[in-house]
Amino acid sequence: MMNQDTLPNLYDLSLAEMERLMTAWGQPAYRARQIFRQLYVNLVDSPLAMTDLPLALRERLVAETRLAPLAPEQVHVADQGLTRKALFRLENGVLIESVLMIYPDRATVCVSTQAGCGMGCVFCATGTLGLLRNLSPGDIVAQVVWAAREMRRFAAERCISPSLAPPDDDSWWTPDTLEDQGSSEARSISVSRLSNIVFMGMGEPFANYDRWWRAVEILHDPRGLNMGARSMTVSTVGLIPGIRRLATETLPINLAISLHAPDDALRSALMPVNRRYPLAALLEATRDYLAATGRRVSFEYVLLQGKNDEPEHAAKLAALLHGEAGTTPLPLHLVHVNLIPWNPVPGMPLGRSERRRVLTFQRILRERGIACTVRVERGVSIAAACGQLAGARGLNVEC
């Protein structure tokens, strides 16, 4: 019997690679398109369910390939069922987490690109694990397939008719509010399928760039899940080579950069990566990215009580983005700041900014002409919010 670990994972294969496999097997190329459709449109979990294929081909797929859909070991639910965090155990035993967030007009899945993370940001639960391993393209794609299946079940339960395609727009930008939308949101749901992907789960995508980008191309393929490029967002701690590489890619993926501090001393204390890629170099790379793409960039800023949330921090951040601190000025019409009140992580001696401080910080930035919103929170009670994913039961916040 062949070792299952050495067999090709169907979720790892692009359509072109699947066509080459079929050709090598003496099959017509259109068989690959049938398989691709079964995987990403019909969302089957076994080659035997691909009933438009000859039985002999289905049996060969079972024998000579792997199809490893993710089945969660745990699913935690919050926000009246509109936020769902899944804990998955991968084939080699490591744990990762994904979060599905359902809104009235869209459904977004937050997926992991690594098991653990080696960036060591002091406010993030994932960083406490260290880097366990990079995820394969198939590991990343399988998380999205899980979310697509969840949305199919959700729509069926609510008798929502499927929409034809996900929005290819800027709907990932967060609403300008801190208010809990509550039960009215649950009643007004009309979305029926997965529409957005954010690569903001466990890990640093640009530290696993090649595998992450292969997953992006598979997810974008119009013959499969057909996720619009502008419906996908990648978040980085500021790995400059990745930012520069993304600027050259043909798919216009949205970019979010974790900033979290307005000066090098504070940012280095919060984010060790700043010692390698300090703010001046990061802003220069951001300016070059904006010039090359013309696409908006979001700066994410986690607010920590008494550490980076004072009015003087907001003023320094505004000066930084305006280029008044000896750094590269940015075209502010292409810049957005996303404020994120810190979400608690057990054992971390940090505090969450008060609402008053959050709104003051936002006001100062807006008065300087900087677009700024506060992220609407989801899943805090189940440790599914920003910075809380740890891929381990012991670090989860109990409901």
UniProtKB/Swiss-Prot annotation:
Gene Ontology terms: cellular component: cytoplasm
Q: Which cofactor does it need?
A: [4Fe-4S] cluster
Q: Does the keyword Metal-binding apply?
A: yes
According to its UniProt record, where is this protein located? Cytoplasm
One MF term from GO for this chain?
tRNA (adenine(37)-C2)-methyltransferase activity
* Taxonomic superkingdom: Bacteria
Domain Radical SAM core, by residue range, is 103-381
EC number(s): the record gives 2.1.1.192
Please list the residues that bind S-adenosyl-L-methionine: 203-204, 235, 258-260, 343
| Principal subcellular localization | cytoplasm
- Which GO biological process annotations does it have? rRNA base methylation; tRNA methylation
Protein family membership: Belongs to the radical SAM superfamily. RlmN family.
What protein name is recorded for this chain?
A: Probable dual-specificity RNA methyltransferase RlmN
Q: Its gene? A: rlmN
